[in-house]
Regions:
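Short coil/turn segments at secondary-structure boundaries
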Residues: 29, 71-78, 176-178
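Short, well-ordered beta-strand elements within core beta-sheets of diverse protein domains
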Residues: 45-49, 147-151, 188-194
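Conserved helix-loop functional segments at active or binding sites
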Residues: 64-68, 132, 169-173
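Non-catalytic DNA-recognition/assembly elements of restriction-modification systems
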Residues: 1-18, 35-69, 193
């Protein structure tokens, strides 16, 4: 999808500028770090961050985190409807997930009604290939390999996306790979500069 590719490229550029270089706009609209913004060493993150930022956990910023689930495969009527059933392959390479290879019927999705994800939820793979992320662009559900943040505060969407992206990139750089599995509790405990 060309639009998705363009949005992803723009997001990557913004991510690097704001969250790696910390050159987000300051109060005067100038790049924070390049304009002499104060930086302090953060022991938890093992890097310099802008002065005044705290280090809360993801789960303290946004409380509604949903771990996906697969409805019973024994009942074929649970599948083949209009509700995207998002997996890691559907997210990979897509900033926004518009469709999925598999779908759920209303019956299948309603059998696990607490697993519905509203538009704009951030889905993050936490089993197998960890750190693959994308925003669902339709009402959807995911399988159990994915934790999703349902946002109470719209302003946290991009921030948490980029913070998690940086977290997973740093984890991979330090170890050569990212963990094989991450529970919902471990995911909610990720510390970010905020």
């Amino acid at each position: 999808m060309p639009i998705n590719d363009n949005l992803e490229a723009m997001a990557k550029q913004l991510y690097d500028y704001w969250f790696v270089q910390f050159d987000f706009p300051n109060e005067e609209g100038k790049p924070y770090k390049s304009s002499g913004g104060a930086m302090v060493w953060n022991e938890k993150l093992k890097r310099e961050i802008p002065q005044g930022l705290g280090t809360p956990k993801i789960g303290d910023i946004e409380k509604n985190i949903i771990t996906g689930k697969t409805p019973s495969c024994a009942d074929e009527d649970n599948f083949g409807g209009d509700i995207p059933f998002v997996t890691i392959d559907d997210i990979r390479g897509n900033l926004f997930v518009f469709e999925a290879q598999r779908t759920l019927s209303t019956k299948g999705a309603d059998s696990q009604e607490k697993k519905y994800l509203p538009i704009g939820s951030l889905s993050v793979s936490c089993i197998g290939t960890i750190g693959v992320m994308g925003f669902v662009a339709r009402l959807a559900q995911t399988n159990q390999q994915i934790n999703s943040i349902v946002f109470e505060h719209e302003y946290n969407k991009e921030f948490l996306y980029f913070s998690l992206k940086l977290y997973f990139e740093n984890a991979k750089a330090k170890t050569g790979n990212v963990f094989a599995n991450m529970s919902k509790e471990e995911f909610a405990s990720i510390i970010v500069a905020y």
